[in-house]
Amino acid sequence: MRTVFLTGGTGFIGKQLVKELAKEDVKILLLVRSKSKAIRIFQERGSLKKAFMHFIEGDLTKIDLGLSAEDKERVLKTDVIIHAGGPMDIQATSKEAASVFLNGAKHINELAKSIHQLKGLQQFIHVVGYMSPFDDTNSKIAIDVFQEGNNYLKIKNPYERTKFLADLYIRQQASAVGYPLSVINPPTVVGSSKTGSTEQIAGLGLLVMSMRRGLMPVIPGGKGYRLPLISNDELAKFIVQVFRLEQPTIQTYTLVEDKQHDQNIAELLSIMSESMNMRAPKISVPMPFMKAIMNSGGSKITKIPSDGLTFITKQKFSNVSAKKIMGGDWFKKTSVMKFFPAVVADLDYRMMYQNGRHNHLFKRTLCDNTTFYQLQGKG
């Protein structure tokens, strides 16, 4: 039985990851701010497994992660670290973002270093994001990310900048200390392929809300652009596949479909508008002009942060390493487009009724993009 130390375990990706890890022969140590709150989250979903789930109170922003002496001793027996912690908040301030991502990376690396020197860390898995500019070749640069990072990486948005600098820092430290590192770069994450339920509304949800209000009359960038997506259950399965591997050094996995096979932004908005019974935008606006509009007050009207447009991209990404693990047809088989209308409907509802609560007594399932709520029982 291997011991996994997981950050972000109560988050949108983390809860799904715990569900997948539960199928393995593991003991999971979850870093949480509040043990009682975390237990309640998993109890409500019927997924609390006390036999192999252990909640450890701490904080990414604190030295030694704020662990008690007893908890630190337990964590030092870890075989694999999965670092998926940090909020999805593109509007975070520089101070907030640096505290969570940069300081968090520093503190968890100190832990990884101690484990590796004590017993040998089998693997460090870091979940970052597909827009990170760093990979296995260009990350071999000797800069102090805390002192020189902001000047080196000229990205205005603090959330993106600090998250990517944290990626660079962990890569630097893994190389220096010698622990195996897997960096997983998912695109924008939506809900499970089984339900479409997307609790994380800060990403795609902002686009859905803008369209619902009739504030997205144009196609940002045009047909050459796209918004890559992945479901949280398929992402979790991929992370577990990487967890099973013996990782010798440092490997990056970018989970973005080949551009020629992916939906472009015009097609995505068309499906979205049809799902919401809204008129689809027809006119394309060049991305530089679109960003200028957003920076000049358009963000206040559409409620989409100007920096949110950076996730709509015309870039091509290398996904060879991901295909090597999952097979050449993995992206096609797991395409979000198969259930995208259900994701849009879920986000539309959540954005309109933000105080609503999901009753976890009912099991939610999809059938041909129709959502069913079932109550388990005997009849």
Region spans (language model):
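N-terminal Rossmann NAD(P)H-binding glycine-rich loop of SDR-like oxidoreductase domains
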Residues: 4-25
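Glycine-rich phosphate-binding loop and adjoining beta1-alpha1-beta2 segment
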Residues: 29-52, 60, 66
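NAD(P)H-binding glycine-rich loop region in Rossmannoid oxidoreductase-like domains
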Residues: 49, 53-104
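Conserved Rossmann-fold NAD(P)-dependent oxidoreductase catalytic core, especially the SDR/UDP-sugar
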Residues: 83, 91, 103-158, 182
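NAD(P)-dependent short-chain dehydrogenase/reductase
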Residues: 140, 172-226, 232-234
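Active-site Tyr-X1-5-Lys
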Residues: 153-182
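Conserved C-terminal active-site "lid" loop/helix of NAD(P)H-dependent oxidoreductases
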Residues: 232, 267, 291-329
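Mid/C-terminal beta-alpha module of Rossmann-like enzyme folds, strongest
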Residues: 238-305, 335, 340-379
